A protein has these predicted regions:
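Short intrinsically disordered terminal tails
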Residues: 1, 191-194
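Non-catalytic interface/linker regions that flank or bridge core catalytic/transmembrane domains
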Residues: 1-35
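Amphipathic alpha-helical segments within well-ordered protein domains
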Residues: 8, 12, 57, 61, ...
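Short low-complexity stretches enriched in small and charged residues
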Residues: 12-13, 32-45, 130
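All-alpha helical catalytic cores of prenyl diphosphate-utilizing isoprenoid enzymes
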Residues: 22-29, 42-54
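Divalent metal-dependent catalytic cores for phosphoryl transfer on phosphate-bearing substrates
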Residues: 39-43, 51, 62-192
Length: 194
């Protein structure tokens, strides 16, 4: 069973709200199941995005899910937090100098081609809401899952602090995303980082 089969199975088993099938149908028209998760770092490989989404789900459920938490909410947030990356990356090549031979070599790479520049977390929320109605905690968690890496936070916004104080799911999703990215997926890039 591949990543896309696991994704569809987990999503279908845990998410029952109106629009679920329409969202899955739409995902099938995008590159979500084959896209990388980043240009050069974690999951910079074919199917890196769906792999990363499943890793975030597994970390979130294994480390942070409590009896009082909502399984459907956790599933939606983990599996769809990076929906903004569907149809976002393009593959290509770049030249890198070989340290041993001194020759320039063409190596595969990914680059960003953002067709809808709406932000990161907020873009994921927007895309999800085209199909599923999100609960406030879900929308906030997905919006702020990047933590300190979010552009508005780097620009000086303190709203993230209010979000994390009010919505534990937002903190849990951010921590699961960090762990999946930097620990679980370490070494998953097929792209030369130079």
């Amino acid at each position: 069973m591949g990543y896309n089969d696991d994704f569809i199975r987990i999503f279908s088993e845990n998410v029952t709200r109106t629009g679920t099938q329409q969202l899955l149908d739409w995902l099938g028209t995008t590159d979500f199941y084959t896209a990388p998760a980043s240009t050069r770092f974690h999951g910079a490989c074919e199917s890196g995005l769906v792999m990363h989404s499943l890793n975030v789900y597994n970390v979130l459920m294994q480390r942070y899910f409590e009896d009082t938490d909502n399984r459907e909410s956790f599933t939606i947030c983990a599996l769809l937090h990076d929906l903004c990356k569907a149809n976002y990356y393009k593959s290509g090549f770049r030249n890198v100098k070989n340290d041993v031979t001194g020759q320039w070599e063409k190596v595969p790479t990914f680059h960003v081609q953002d067709q809808f520049p709406f932000g990161h977390g907020e873009k994921s929320v927007y895309l999800i809401e085209r199909f599923l109605r999100l609960k406030p905690a879900e929308a906030v968690a997905i919006r702020w899952h990047m933590g300190g890496f979010d552009d508005s936070v780097r620009g000086g916004s303190f709203t993230i602090s209010d979000a994390y104080n009010e919505y534990p799911l937002a903190v849990k999703l951010h921590l699961a995303d960090l762990e999946a990215t930097y620990l679980v997926e370490k070494g998953t890039s097929s792209v030369n980082r130079r």
